[in-house]
From Swiss-Prot:
It comes from Capsicum annuum var. annuum. The keyword Cell membrane does not apply. [2Fe-2S] cluster binds at C39, C44, C47, C77. One of its GO terms (molecular function) is electron transfer activity. This is Ferredoxin.
Amino acid sequence: ASYKVKLITPDGPIEFDCPDDVYILDQAEEAGHDLPYSCRAGSCSSCAGKIAGGAVDQTDGNFLDDDQLEEGWVLTCVAYPQSDVTIETHKEAELVG
């Protein structure tokens, strides 16, 4: 399946289709968009975003704790869309405080 992903970036919203077996960060780059990242392995906070709607599978990541996951934090480098999803990007500073 493929889902509509909407990313709310500081430069405005971007939208693209993302298969459910492709990480959102990878698909965003494939679509020509530059997003922040560092490790690409779900073990840092560079690519962190916040889910504004929809659902993702990010079980490949290990940086976020259960509370952060419940609050809607997402690491786009290890997130597969599970529905149409809207994510606010560039949120690392807010996450790590």
